[in-house]
């Protein structure tokens, strides 16, 4: 929410952030690895910039991107020391340009009549002034980083570029044990949740009141998004409605889901749960979950598989090559 914050950078970065890095003349990078999800096409990343890279790991310096000023140091110590040398300068013209980019392509999602991810994030922002949000891996991870307002008291934990599906629930368990009394919300997809759902037993045993949100679109959503945008809608092994006889006719009404009933499964572990299908039921569901002081609580949200993550940089593209919608 800081006025100078302009959003995520990279493959699912905000338009303004990607344009700012592409057009800047000086780039301070603190603790990043410059992985491919951040840079896009390497030789066109920040083409006009002198790059200052602060990292405590010597091996990360100039590994992917050549940097002009390498600084091997603890980030906090380096920033504190550098702040002593900062002088005021006029950035009005540059900030005006950034504001133009922000207004040109603000982050947005389609408004769904029943419910969409943005409705859920709006409730989280409104209802939880203090919380720890832990995400799994997939579309919900990117959407959370885009639409949940991160503040001093509302923190976000994710596994970054490691791609560790199944991280959400055990990550939330660790966060709750380390921060008793603080609301901990894990956000997972129906695919990632099933990779470590057995850890509900641990959460019940340790009496951890985690709120576990499942964005259930009956798909491995991020992979499906790639198949839709870049592989001619040839959906393979991503639809969790598909059986052995499926011939890829996505949307067949008679095709049954191959995911469990998450609410009954939660109850079988001794946890609690509720299924939400309408936006007016989101806020009451979170209020009910907050009443559970010693028991994990699952909220399953039924999500449209066409709720995709935008913007998106084309594979092999530059930060300028953003798909804004399709």
Give short role names for the model-derived ranges.
Residues 25, 31-34, 79-90, 102-106, ...:
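Structural signal for hydrophobic packing residues in well-ordered secondary-structure cores
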Residues 54, 61-96:
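Terminal amphipathic helices with adjacent charged low-complexity linkers/tails
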Residues 30-31, 74, 137, 302:
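Glycine-rich, N-terminal phosphate-binding loop of Rossmann-like dinucleotide-binding domains
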Residues 10-60:
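Phosphate/diphosphate-binding loops
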Residues 53, 134, 187-188:
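Generic enzyme active-site microenvironment
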Residues 89-101, 300-303:
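Short, flexible loop/turn segments with low-complexity composition
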Residues 5, 11-12, 18, 23, ...:
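Thiamine diphosphate
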Residues 2, 99-175, 181:
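Active-site diphosphate/adenylate-binding microenvironment
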């Amino acid at each position: 929410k800081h006025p100078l914050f302009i959003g995520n950078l990279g493959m699912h970065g905000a338009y303004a952030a990607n344009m700012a890095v592409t057009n800047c003349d000086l780039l301070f990078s603190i603790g990043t690895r410059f992985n491919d999800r951040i840079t896009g096409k390497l030789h066109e990343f920040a083409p006009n910039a002198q790059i200052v890279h602060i990292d405590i790991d010597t091996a990360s310096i100039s590994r992917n991107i050549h940097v002009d000023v390498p600084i091997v140091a603890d980030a906090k110590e380096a920033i504190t020391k550098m702040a002593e040398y900062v002088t005021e300068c006029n950035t009005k013209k540059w900030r005006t340009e950034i504001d133009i980019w922000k207004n040109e392509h603000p982050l947005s999602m389609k408004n769904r009549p029943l419910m969409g991810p943005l409705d859920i994030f709006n409730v989280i922002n409104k209802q939880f002034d203090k919380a720890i949000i832990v995400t799994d891996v997939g579309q919900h991870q990117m959407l959370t980083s885009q639409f949940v307002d991160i503040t001093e008291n509302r923190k976000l934990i994710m596994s970054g570029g490691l791609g560790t599906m199944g991280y959400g629930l055990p990550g939330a368990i660790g966060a709750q044990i380390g921060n008793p009394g603080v609301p901990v919300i894990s956000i997972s997809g129906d695919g990632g949740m099933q990779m470590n759902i057995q850890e509900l037993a641990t959460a019940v045993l340790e009496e951890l009141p985690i709120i576990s949100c499942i964005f259930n679109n009956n798909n491995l959503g991020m992979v499906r998004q790639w198949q839709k945008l870049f592989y001619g809608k040839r959906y393979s092994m991503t639809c969790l409605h598909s059986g052995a006889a499926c011939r890829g006719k996505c949307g067949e009404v008679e095709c049954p889901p191959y995911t469990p009933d998450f609410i009954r499964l939660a109850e079988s572990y001794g946890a609690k749960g509720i299924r939400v299908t309408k936006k007016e039921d989101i806020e009451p569901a979170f209020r009910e979950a907050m009443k559970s002081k010693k028991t994990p609580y699952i909220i399953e949200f039924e999500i449209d598989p066409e709720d995709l993550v935008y913007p998106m940089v084309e594979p092999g593209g530059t930060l300028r090559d953003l798909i804004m919608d399709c």
